[in-house]
A protein has these predicted regions:
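Short, conserved catalytic-motif segment at the N-terminal edge
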Residues: 36-95, 118-120, 164-169, 251, ...
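Bacterial N-terminal signal peptides that target proteins for export
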Residues: 3-15
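Short active-site loop at a secondary-structure junction
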Residues: 51-64, 84-144, 177-189, 261-264
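Short, surface-exposed loop or secondary-structure junction motifs
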Residues: 77, 81, 135-335
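Short, gly/Ser/Thr-rich active-site loops of penicillin-recognizing serine hydrolases
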Residues: 282, 296, 301, 309, ...
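Boundary at the C-terminal end of the N-terminal hydrophobic targeting segment
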Residues: 26-30
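Short, surface-exposed beta-strand/loop micro-motifs that present aromatic residues
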Residues: 265, 335, 342-355
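Bacterial N-terminal signal peptides
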Residues: 13-25
Length: 403
């Protein structure tokens, strides 16, 4: 009898231990179950997305709200593409996240290489691109590419050798203003940064960010050129010639570059992006593992460029600019984020401990005003419903570049 009781006690202890271990590891397998609030709280978000679908802005999408501990709310809406018979959007639908590539792949890669002292944020670009030598751009720094203050502008690439065309075209073009004096959002800045990662490491950007970020974070559905084995989960996009694209990057320059580019090309899910956002709100740590240094996170999210308060940029991240619609009216001055042309956006507020992810199957690319309003309204609602902090705070401390 005593032996049986000891065995039962031991078994019970083992079960309790396993349950505790499972509870701590739950986010490793997937974010914790979202707190699906009843009544008016979620009804407001449902109504907002329902209106966007009824007005033809989007076919459907996924909304996810979280904090540094995990997911607070997640919900899928509508269809996964414009096709009338398209499958419904699911929480794990995989979206082309377009320019979010800049902040979840390219900029973190540059900061990680800087903290490893493999490059410096104040390196002249010519150090890594000898093609720029003698072209009047000796003062152009890596920092200028990250903040879109290089003076470079976008241009079409030759189809025969698009990467060579991109680098040579950037090196030879006349700058739009003095270096560092003007904010001009241009994809070419991040195309160069993506190629810089390859030249510094000897690895493709896709390989480097998978090894450094996506795999350690457990972002299993995040990649450039996602595998066809996940084709049934893709949200389709529409190319400029009205072709439906499934698992192929929508951005034409990224397609020319083989689907791997510093400005666009990553595909992801809302839950994978939640992992990345949690890491950033925890100053570079995720589930006890260091992904980026706290200093690198603070550097990326500090204000590096300001034009009379009208444009404030971090390193890759947007803080306050004409592109800041996802900031809404409830996020603080230290919040930051980015948008993607395909209908994606993320916005994070460390002072209020909240982030918002919006991934959509966008239909109307011309109605930018209403789409910006959708992003803004979602963040305003999310802050109102889920954030315990409402007061605004001062701009973050600028740690300065790694040298």
């Amino acid at each position: 009898m005593i032996f049986l009781m000891q065995r039962k006690t031991s078994l019970l202890a083992s079960i309790i231990t396993l349950l505790l271990l499972f509870s701590f590891a739950a986010f490793a397998a997937a974010p914790p179950p979202a707190l699906q609030e009843p009544g008016e709280r979620t009804a407001k978000i449902d109504l907002l997305l329902g209106n966007a679908m009824s007005r033809g802005l989007i076919a459907g999408g996924v909304v996810l709200v979280g904090n540094r501990k995990g997911v607070l709310f997640e919900r899928a809406y509508g269809r996964s593409s414009a096709e009338p018979n398209a499958p419904p959007t699911e929480i794990d639908t995989i979206f082309d996240i377009a320019s979010l590539t800049k902040v979840i792949a390219t900029a973190p890669a540059i900061l990680k290489l800087a903290e490893e002292r493999k490059l410096s944020l104040v390196d002249p670009v010519v150090r890594w691109f000898p093609e720029f030598a003698g072209k009047g751009k000796n003062d152009l720094l890596v920092l200028n590419l990250l903040t879109h203050t290089s003076g470079l502008d976008d241009f079409p690439f030759a189809s025969a050798d698009p990467l060579h065309s991109a680098v040579e075209g950037a090196a030879g073009q006349t700058l739009k203003g003095e270096i560092g004096s003007r904010f001009k959002y241009a994809d070419i800045n991040f195309i160069l940064l993506g190629e810089m990662v390859r030249r510094v490491t000897g690895m493709g950007l896709d390989q480097y960010v998978a090894a450094s970020f996506f795999t350690p974070l457990g972002m299993k559905d995040t990649a450039f050129n996602p595998g066809r084995d996940k084709a049934l989960r893709f949200s389709a996009t529409i190319s400029s010639d009205k072709t439906t694209l499934l698992g192929l990057v929508q951005d034409p320059e990224a397609r020319q570059l083989g689907g791997v580019a510093g400005h666009a090309g990553v595909f992801s899910t809302a839950r994978d992006l939640a992992r990345f956002c949690c890491m950033f709100l925890n100053e570079g740590e995720f589930e006890g593992r260091r992904i980026l240094s706290g200093r690198a996170v603070r550097q990326m999210t500090a204000p590096y460029f300001s034009r009379g308060g009208q444009v404030i940029r971090g390193l890759g991240w947007d803080i306050s600019s004409p592109f800041s619609s996802p900031k809404g009216n409830g996020f603080s001055e230290v919040s930051f984020g980015h948008t993607g042309y395909s209908g994606s956006s993320i916005w994070l507020d460390p002072s209020a401990d909240i982030f918002v992810v919006l991934l959509t199957a966008r239909l109307d690319y011309k109605n930018t005003k209403d789409f910006s309003q959708l992003r803004s309204d979602l963040s305003t609602l999310s802050a109102e419903l889920f954030s315990p902090v409402t007061e605004k705070s001062k701009l973050a401390h600028n740690d300065g570049p790694n040298r």
